């Protein structure tokens, strides 16, 4: 089968062959041919599969056997039988190819040869090599010669391999000037032996089996686009020649695990670097000011920490960052793990620096990317650390970067937390608050906030706290692993402190490492040393004696009634009063008893 792209000419052997003579379908370069081989006098023109090229129709006359070319606006397939007695041509319109997608700006200087160009044989000058086996009759009479031909072909192949190693195995692209492609290269001499290499502008090498490539090779000096893909390269060494004109470099789909860190030292014009589907763990540094687009997808050994340094460099842009991953060493609460994190997630860490708070009249906070919080369903978040310490602030910053997990406001003059933890969305993700050495007098502002539900660390040492709210005692340490630091605060101690706060500190001593250093402001001792018996004594309460007084009065009243009744009975029965009653002065009411 003979397939050409863009243009083709009939070979003399094709013009003389019989149209009815069957030909053997011969696999070439490891590719199987499943379709039957057409007659030699038929020539098919196939449009390229990637980049559309003007199609060429071939017309063939029986008398002269000459081939003429005609360019059409649409791809066509032309087949002309040799048995025609007059010059005829038949044109069958091929289905319209879909419009090629618009090429990204960063690929405008890149050259790639279609894969099908490597599927057919060529001689050392870029012409198609004669198909020897294709012209051997497969009739029964020729079967006896098959074994001998196979032996000769095997010997010829070994000789060809030896000859090809020292001859040019590259071919000029049929549609793009000064652009060459090389296929199935096992030695660099197959490229360096080509003529006029210094005039090459673009080069695409497919299936290069050389393990190590020296980038300082003069072959690459004049190139603007270099693609070495679909091979078995494992290592690149040295750097490109000085003042290289290279604008596009693609080494995708190899086994490369090592790249020189200074390979771009003398490549000032590079715009695209494709290194996808390799075994790389690092991206080489790019010290030029020019922007460069890189594709690192498919490198499953890529490390996040060095990659994050490159991401912070504004001159790097990434292709498909959502599906380009790197290995991140994550530290969880109880263990460490290695997780896959997308470049898109790493790029979001840049916002931690760009949105760092600047406080008028006080100065700028310092922000840095701390780590990545791994969440399921590819929703991992970068942790931003905001340091606003030692600025003399009197209130909290009005806004923080997104995904701020750590806020450090140590050594300021802040007196109140305000309503930031309740109403400010940029405070909702904080799980570590470092607020030592301030003048904060209350933590009631934490009540009902997301912070009190999610925090892991609170540092409130050396502040002006006077009381620990009851809600804080009940809810702050419900989850294990949380830590609260309150040393240096002088609380107002009373009986309730001795009963409730002291017990809370004893029960949560592991969660409050400095509980021994929490002191009282009204008693010269620490809270943990309070004695309930002393603090909970109450002054005498005279209301307890009222009941005794009432009881005594009732008893006296009953005794008086009894005495009067007795005296009356004695007087009625004996006619005289008892001695105590007779000595008592008479009262105006005594006449009632005498009547």
UniProtKB/Swiss-Prot annotation:
Keyword Iron-sulfur: no
Keywords from the UniProt entry: Glycoprotein, Leucine-rich repeat, Repeat
Ranges of residues in domain LRRNT: 347-402
Domain of life of the organism encoding this protein: Eukaryota
Region ranges (Disordered): 1-42, 64-98
Glycosylation sites: 250, 255
Keyword Cytoplasm: no
Function statement: Has a role in the ecdysone induced cascade; probably indirect control of 'late' ecdysone genes.
Gene3D superfamilies reported for this sequence: Ribonuclease Inhibitor
UniProt cross-references to PROSITE patterns, sorted A to Z: LRR
Protein name in the entry: Protein halfway
Pfam families: LRR_8
Ranges in coiled-coil conformation: none
TM stretches of this protein: none
Domain LRRCT span(s) in chain numbering: 489-538
LRR repeats: 403-424, 429-450, 454-475
Annotated GO biological process: intracellular signal transduction; pupariation; response to ecdysone
């Amino acid at each position: 089968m003979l397939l050409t792209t863009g243009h083709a000419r009939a070979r003399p052997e094709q013009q003389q062959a019989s149209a009815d003579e069957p030909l053997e379908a011969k696999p070439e370069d490891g590719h199987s041919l499943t379709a039957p081989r057409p007659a030699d006098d038929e020539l098919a023109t196939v449009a390229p599969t990637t980049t559309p090229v003007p199609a060429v129709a071939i017309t063939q006359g029986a008398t002269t056997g000459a081939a003429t070319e005609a360019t059409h606006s649409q791809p066509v397939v032309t087949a002309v039988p040799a048995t025609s007695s007059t010059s005829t041509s038949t044109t069958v319109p091929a289905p319209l190819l879909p419009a090629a997608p618009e090429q990204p700006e960063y690929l405008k200087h890149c050259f790639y040869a279609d894969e099908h160009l490597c599927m057919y044989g060529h001689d050392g000058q870029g012409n198609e090599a004669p198909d020897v086996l294709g012209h051997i009759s497969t009739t029964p009479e020729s079967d006896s010669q098959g074994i001998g031909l196979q032996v000769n072909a095997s010997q010829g192949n070994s000789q060809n391999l030896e000859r090809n190693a020292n001859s040019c195995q590259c071919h000029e692209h049929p549609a793009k000037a000064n652009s060459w492609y090389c296929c199935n290269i096992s030695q660099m001499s197959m490229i360096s032996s080509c003529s006029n290499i210094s005039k090459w502008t673009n080069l695409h090498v497919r299936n290069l089996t050389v393990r190590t490539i020296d980038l300082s090779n003069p072959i690459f000096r004049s190139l603007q686009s270099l693609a070495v893909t679909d091979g078995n390269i494992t290592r690149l060494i040295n750097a490109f020649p000085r003042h290289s004109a290279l604008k596009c470099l693609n080494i995708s789909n190899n086994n490369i695990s090592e790249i020189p860190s200074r390979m771009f030292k003398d490549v000032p014009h590079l715009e695209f670097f494709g290194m996808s589907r390799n075994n790389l763990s690092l991206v080489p540094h790019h010290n030029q000011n020019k922007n460069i687009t890189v594709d690192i997808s498919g490198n499953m050994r890529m490390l996040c920490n060095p990659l994050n340094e490159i991401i912070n460099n504004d001159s790097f842009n990434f292709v498909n960052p959502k599906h380009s991953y790197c290995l991140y060493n994550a530290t969880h609460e109880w263990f460490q793990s290695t997780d896959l994190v997308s470049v898109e997630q790493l790029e979001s860490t840049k916002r931690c620096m760009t949105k760092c708070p600047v406080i008028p009249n006080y100065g700028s906070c310092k922000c840095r990317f701390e780590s990545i919080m791994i969440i399921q369903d590819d929703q991992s978040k970068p942790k931003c650390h905001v340091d606003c310490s030692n600025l003399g602030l009197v209130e909290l910053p009005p806004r923080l970067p997104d995904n701020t997990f750590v806020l450090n406001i140590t050594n300021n003059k802040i007196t109140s937390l305000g309503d930031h933890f309740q109403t400010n969305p940029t405070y909702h993700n904080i799980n570590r608050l470092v607020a030592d050495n301030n003048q904060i007098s209350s933590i009631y502002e934490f009540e009902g906030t997301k912070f009190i539900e999610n925090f892991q660390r609170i540092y409130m040492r050396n502040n002006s706290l006077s009381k620990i709210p009851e809600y804080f005692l009940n809810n702050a340490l419900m989850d294990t692993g949380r830590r609260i630091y309150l040393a240096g605060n002088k609380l107002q101690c009373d009986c309730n402190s001795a009963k409730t706060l002291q017990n809370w500190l004893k029960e949560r001593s592991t969660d409050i490492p400095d509980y021994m250093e929490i002191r009282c402001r009204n008693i010269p001792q620490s809270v943990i040393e309070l004695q309930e018996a002393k603090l909970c004594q109450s002054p005498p309460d005279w209301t307890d004696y009222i009941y005794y007084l009432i009881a005594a009065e009732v008893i006296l009243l009953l005794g008086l009634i009894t005495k009067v009744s007795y005296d009356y009975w004695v007087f009625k029965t004996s006619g005289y009063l008892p001695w105590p009653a007779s000595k008592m002065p008479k009262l105006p009411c005594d006449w009632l008893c005498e009547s």
